[in-house]
């Protein structure tokens, strides 16, 4: 059984039920620990929730991750969430940038900031409010870099340098930044958003940049320590030593969506370094299909070459891949529910599927690149966007990531 919880941050001052109130014989006693000076506190509004939707991450491996978004629909028959209703407890507090956190069985699902309160009035004196929310990437997208003149440094140091800028001022406790393996150019930057520049850093690293489900900024270097799969999404309910979750839907594709026979890369140096490589055999089979990126920050030409090779060996052939898998949380037991809610972008899972129940089964390790939730009272669905794991870290002695003679040694 899944129990969603939605909490919103308000500063109600003296109206806070547990807040200190001057001259009150109960709430105004000095040195008490029950009634405290209020400030912004989280208030549980779960009893009003009609639906919750969340979308984080991306749907294609070569896309960049933009701001995660969420939408929460609440019962508003009593006008509690009407910004013009002066008698409402939250009057004066219903403004953008209020913090919201969404949990399920006390597991974090989404942490973001209010963008809009959209009111809808329905026949029969019914009313709802839809709260639109974006994660902290929304703020970074609106934070222009005034001027940055960095030294040549590793990608992780560059991420921290940007986050430390006065115009960004990202808290130390809300970041998890790995060191990085790519040396970046010392070129001056101005007039671009902090998010756009950080995404360029991540692409140059061949890493991963996202906001976690509990609101932290995460930067993973390439070849970051890889989790070995301990969860299988399957259409087979046979007992297993590994946690197995029955999916309700799986989407698989095979074709040219991510097929590139030529890779063209360049950095943004004053005299750009350029790399163009091609798999001529693949071009003969599929024609010229070019992936190009001329906005990279890599300083070392050899590093550009390695990145191009990594991209080519990954995408120079059509791949059968699982694009997404959906589970119905209402149908899972407590162990399965906790395992699903614990998954995060970058985690590795295994998908086991027998099409039309005609053997043999298809079994592939995949990396999670996106997570979406669509929860209503009748049914609560969670969908994971997937990247086929044909390129990643080689893990010695791992049954899935330790196979010899494959392309997963990376660089």
Task: Name each region found by the language model.
Residues 1-46, 152, 196-378, 390-411:
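Acidic, small/polar-enriched beta strand-loop surface segments
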Residues 68, 110, 127-129, 215, ...:
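Envelope-exposed proteins and targeting segments
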Residues 73, 103, 132-134, 350-352, ...:
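Residue-level recognition of well-ordered beta-strand positions that form the cores
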Residues 74-78, 133-138, 189, 219-228, ...:
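Secondary-structure transition/turn motif
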């Amino acid at each position: 059984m899944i129990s969603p919880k939605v909490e919103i941050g308000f500063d109600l001052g003296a109206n806070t039920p547990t807040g200190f109130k001057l001259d009150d014989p109960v709430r105004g006693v000095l040195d008490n620990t029950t009634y405290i000076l209020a400030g912004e506190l989280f208030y549980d509004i779960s009893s009003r929730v009609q639906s919750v939707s969340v979308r984080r991450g991306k749907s294609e491996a070569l896309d960049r991750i933009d701001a995660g978004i969420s939408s929460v629909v609440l019962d508003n028959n009593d006008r509690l969430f009407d910004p013009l209703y002066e008698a409402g407890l939250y009057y004066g507090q219903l403004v953008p940038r209020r913090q919201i956190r969404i949990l399920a069985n006390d597991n974090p699902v989404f942490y973001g900031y209010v963008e809009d309160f959209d009111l809808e009035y329905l026949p029969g004196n019914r009313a709802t409010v839809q709260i639109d929310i974006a994660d902290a990437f929304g703020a970074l997208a609106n934070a222009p870099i005034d001027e940055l003149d960095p030294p040549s440094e590793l990608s992780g140091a560059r991420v921290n340098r940007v986050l430390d800028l006065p115009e960004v001022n990202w808290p130390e406790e809300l970041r998890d930044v790995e060191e990085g393996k790519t040396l970046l150019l010392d070129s001056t930057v101005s007039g671009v958003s902090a998010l756009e520049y950080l995404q360029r850093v991540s692409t140059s690293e061949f890493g991963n940049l996202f906001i976690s489900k509990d609101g932290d900024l995460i930067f993973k270097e390439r070849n970051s320590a890889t989790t070995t799969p301990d969860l299988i999404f399957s259409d087979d309910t046979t007992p297993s030593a590994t946690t197995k979750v029955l999916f309700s839907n799986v989407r698989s594709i095979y074709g040219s969506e991510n097929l590139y026979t030529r890779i063209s890369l360049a950095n943004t140096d004053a005299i750009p370094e350029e790399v163009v490589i091609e798999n001529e055999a693949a071009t003969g089979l599929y024609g010229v299909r070019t992936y190009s990126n001329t906005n990279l920050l890599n300083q070392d030409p050899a590093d550009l070459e390695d990145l191009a090779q990594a991209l080519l060996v990954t995408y120079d052939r059509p791949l059968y891949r699982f694009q997404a898998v959906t589970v119905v949380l209402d149908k899972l037991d407590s162990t399965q529910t906790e395992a699903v809610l614990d998954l995060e972008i970058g985690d590795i899972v295994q998908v086991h599927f027998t099409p039309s129940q005609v053997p043999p089964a298809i079994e592939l390790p995949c990396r999670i690149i996106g997570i979406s939730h669509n929860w209503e009272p009748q049914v609560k669905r969670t969908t994971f966007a997937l990247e086929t794991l044909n390129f990643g870290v080689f893990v010695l002695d791992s049954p899935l990531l330790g196979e010899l003679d494959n392309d997963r040694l990376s660089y």
